[in-house]
From Swiss-Prot:
InterPro entries to which the protein is assigned, alphabetical: Calcineurin-like_PHP_ApaH, DNA_Repair-Maintenance_Comp, Metallo-depent_PP-like
Record SUPFAM superfamilies: Metallo-dependent phosphatases (SSF56300)
Family note: Belongs to the metallophosphoesterase superfamily.
Pfam families listed in its UniProt record: Metallophos
Gene3D superfamilies xref list: 3.60.21.10
CDD domains per UniProt: MPP_superfamily
GO BP term, pick one: DNA repair
Name of the protein in its database record: Uncharacterized metallophosphoesterase-like protein YydB
Molecular function in Gene Ontology: DNA binding; DNA exonuclease activity
Length: 481
């Protein structure tokens, strides 16, 4: 299962010159081209829709609707946070922010503000809140400030980084109202977040713009709640940062460029593809060619982007495959395993004739190498192989299973292999898919626990890999587009 989305930031819509207008028009056409490659699941808009606090007129909404239409989405799949240019500034708000920042503990003072003072800060975003309700069709949760969206394939934590945004040079000092932020993030289901779902946080400002101690708290929360990606804008120049060796669960910070062309901004946006089955993530940066007026991949962002793409692995998702393969190493009851095989044959009432070709087996080491199988799978295969004799004993005798049903197990597993092997990039994923599919079909009619049923199916699948003509494809020769 895959997830695909775009991040567009710093539209600054009221800023318009010739290059910017042409670039924005071409962007809509280019997004349609990208969509023809593969469908999008959602859109992230990470702030600065307006320019210098200007009004959100019908032209703004029309352009955003054009992006959404080009992506083939509805507004239910759009996630939008404010930027510092979406703020209206006034003297009262500025004086309040100054008093907070000059206090001995600004973060604590912000958390303890009374409602009247909080309202002064929040009112700076009133135009944005009104636009959000008008455009999105739902109210912005201004009292919560930060909020959570959850779905089957992905979760989005929207962080409002602009509560104290007020002046130039504030990067590295911004506060988020951490009590409110923690209240939002703790709504995430930790157990669900550990599963096959992409966990994203978005904000306008990069983490480097947040005050240092609060930034470390945010990173700790990301660690605790399995956040995989943080996406931001603000700096008008794309970048990426991996928090490797910092957290138990590293996350990738992606920063998009802007959708304006001036002497300061890099016109750029980001496309992200994530394979939820193995954590393989592909980030593509698209940049505007001002001279020849077209969008293309940007391969100038460092050595890892030489091909115009950043390849990254979400280890949390990758490890789920290993967990699916793993089970306890307890010895199984061979008599019960025999009963399972017999029961399985009885369950498979209809079947086609299948003949395995034992003369054309290729070496296991070559199978595992060509199929890009991991060490965990190879180790479990070795442990399961001690039960192959039990299976062969049943298959060699008509005392357990009638001769006309001898090939049912092999046929079932081979059919599943043929159905799924082209959908996955390595043997581990194919193995897990085969086991899960057979389990879903038969577990309700077999009198064994879930754990035992899955373990027995794993053993039978490994036996079939050894005895039958499956796992002979070469995944190393397949190039991923």
């Amino acid at each position: 299962m895959k997830v695909r989305f775009l991040q567009i930031s710093d539209l600054h819509f009221q800023f318009q010159n010739y290059d910017t207008i042409v670039m924005r028009d071409k962007l809509l056409d280019f997004i349609e081209v990208l969509r023809r490659e593969s469908d999008f699941d959602f859109l992230l808009l990470t702030g600065d829709i307006a320019h210098k606090g200007d009004v959100y007129n019908e032209d703004v909404k029309e352009y955003l609707n054009g992006i959404i239409k080009s992506m083939g989405l509805s507004k239910n799949n759009v996630h939008l946070v404010p930027g510092n240019h979406d703020i209206s500034r006034d003297m009262t708000r500025t004086l309040l922010i100054d008093s907070i920042m000059k206090s001995p503990n600004p973060s604590e003072m912000l958390d303890k503000l009374d409602q009247k003072a909080t309202n002064i800060l929040v009112e700076g975003q009133r135009k944005f809140f009104d636009f959000y309700e008008d455009f999105m069709g739902v109210k912005y949760p201004e009292e919560d400030l930060h909020f959570l969206y959850q779905s089957e394939k992905y979760n989005v934590l929207s962080i409002n980084t602009c509560l104290l945004s007020d002046k130039k040079g504030e990067e590295g000092t911004l506060l988020t109202a951490q009590m409110k932020l923690y209240k939002a993030i703790r709504k995430m289901n930790k157990e669900k977040n550990k599963g096959k779902v992409l966990n994203i946080a978005i904000g306008h400002h990069t983490l480097g713009c947040i005050e240092s101690s609060e930034r470390e708290s945010i990173k700790a929360h990301f660690d605790d709640y399995f956040i995989d990606l943080y996406l931001a804008g603000h700096v008008h120049d794309s970048s990426f940062n991996i928090t490797a060796n910092t957290n138990e669960n590293p996350f990738l910070e992606l920063v998009s460029g802007a959708i304006i062309k001036d002497e300061y901004a890099t016109p750029e946006f980001i496309s992200v593809d994530v394979n939820l089955d193995n954590g393989e993530t592909e980030v593509t940066y698209y940049i505007w060619n001002t001279e020849y007026k077209y969008w293309s991949k940007n391969n100038q962002g460092g050595r890892r982007l030489q091909e115009g793409k950043l390849n990254y692995k979400i280890n949390r998702l990758e490890s789920l495959i290993e967990k699916e393969i793993e089970d306890n190493d307890d010895k199984i009851d061979e008599d019960e395993f025999k009963s399972f095989i017999i029961d399985f044959h009885e369950y498979r009432e209809s079947y086609k004739t299948f003949t395995s070709n034992f003369d054309n087996q290729i070496g296991l080491d070559k199978k595992f190498y060509d199929m890009k199988s991991g060490e965990t799978f190879k180790r479990k295969f070795d442990s399961y192989s001690e039960y192959f004799g039990v299976i062969n004993h049943i298959m060699d005798s008509t005392s357990y299973v009638s001769a006309d049903k001898k090939e049912l197990i092999a046929e079932t597993i081979v059919d599943k292999y043929l159905e799924f092997h082209n959908q996955y990039n390595n043997g581990d994923e194919i193995f897990v898919k085969i086991v899960n599919e057979i389990y879903l079909e038969c577990h309700s009619v077999l009198p064994y626990s879930k754990a035992l049923t899955k373990k027995y199916i794993k053993i039978l699948t490994c036996w079939c890999i050894y005895e039958c003509e499956i796992f002979n494809d070469n995944k190393r020769s397949v190039k991923n587009d």
